[in-house]
């Protein structure tokens, strides 16, 4: 399973790679044959089918503590395997007939037979790498050293306009509840108790351009930045593959007529799962809010069912039966999932 997971990132990034003869240096194969991307995908799907048949939930690991993803839970590894297979199938769904059985037929085969092909059922099944937060075990994918807060780092990681524009619209007051988990606005705190503090309006950075491209002359003015306390704290996990992505896959499969069920219901369940996943990070937040005296207080964040219902009913998010709306929200849900998944999803 992990071999396919890692090799899928390589082929999605670079196309043709060594696969069938790769990782065989011990057998004397030092110059492995390069396979086409279709050959790689065919082989990866075959290996995930094989892996599914090999997992035995009645057996455990001799030392479950060595498993930093599922703690030796074999049943969850099997769910991860089949959900990963669905990710890869949907990624090549534009070439439906290039595979035998077709992509749609394989997706239907998995989803319609949960007894043989169990998949993620909740956020409890998410594939994440956990970190203890001590010594070298705080160095996550996004965190090369211990960064407990945003001190001296807020100038480093600005939020792109493409992301911010899906989360925030000042013209009508739209704010995705996940924004306060992922992003912090610029703010000014004055020492005087009578002088009001200021929270800046948020304007996203234009990717690939200088900081003043959008008319801002100082990074301290309006460009928001990553919410370090929630995202790169020393014990925050790496997300590899999550339940919300599975639900988006089901929504797209339903739109394509490959599986039964309502695309709208799968879509709304996906966004709900994403919000619930990120809501758990709110206890680490340090988000600026103005109190009754117009002074800033840094607070934790909660995402309530009311917040989620309002999000699903908003003009920016509510289901409109289009691939664009589905693609935008799936792309957004892949924020902070490792392996360049937002990029791969956009390219497909």
Stretch-by-stretch model annotation:
Residues 274-348:
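C-terminal functional modules
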Residues 1-282, 320-323, 329:
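Structured, solvent-exposed acidic/aromatic patches
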């Amino acid at each position: 399973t992990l071999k396919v997971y890692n090799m899928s990132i390589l082929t999605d990034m670079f196309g043709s790679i060594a696969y069938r003869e790769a990782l065989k240096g011990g057998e004397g194969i030092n110059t492995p044959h390069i396979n086409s991307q279709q050959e790689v995908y065919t082989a990866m799907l075959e290996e995930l089918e094989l892996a599914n048949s090999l997992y035995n939930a009645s057996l455990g690991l001799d030392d479950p503590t060595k498993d930093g993803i599922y703690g030796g839970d074999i049943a969850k590894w099997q769910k991860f395997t089949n959900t990963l297979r669905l990710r890869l199938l949907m990624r090549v769904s534009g070439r439906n007939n290039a595979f035998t059985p077709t992509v749609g037929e394989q997706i239907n085969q998995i989803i319609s037979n949960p007894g043989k092909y169990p998949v993620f059922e909740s956020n409890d099944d998410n594939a994440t790498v956990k970190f203890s937060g001590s010594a070298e075990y705080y160095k996550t994918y996004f965190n090369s050293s211990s960064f407990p807060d945003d001190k001296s780092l807020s100038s480093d990681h600005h939020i792109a306009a493409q992301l911010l524009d899906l989360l925030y619209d000042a013209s009508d007051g739209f704010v995705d509840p996940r924004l306060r988990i992922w992003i912090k606005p610029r703010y000014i705190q004055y020492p005087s108790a009578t002088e009001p503090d200021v929270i800046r309006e948020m304007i996203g950075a234009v990717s690939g351009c200088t900081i003043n491209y959008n008319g801002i002359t100082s990074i301290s003015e309006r460009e928001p930045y990553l919410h370090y306390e929630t995202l790169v704290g020393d014990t925050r996990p790496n997300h590899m593959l999550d339940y919300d992505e599975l639900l988006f896959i089901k929504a797209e499969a339903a739109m394509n007529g490959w599986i039964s069920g309502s695309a709208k219901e799968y879509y709304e369940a996906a966004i709900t799962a994403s919000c619930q996943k990120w809501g758990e990070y709110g206890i680490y937040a340090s988000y600026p809010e103005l109190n009754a005296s117009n002074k800033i207080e840094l607070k934790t964040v909660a995402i309530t069912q009311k917040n989620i219902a309002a999000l699903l009913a908003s003009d920016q998010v509510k289901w409109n039966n289009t691939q664009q709306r589905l693609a935008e929200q799936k792309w957004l849900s892949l924020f902070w999932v490792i392996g360049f998944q937002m990029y791969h999803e956009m390219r497909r």
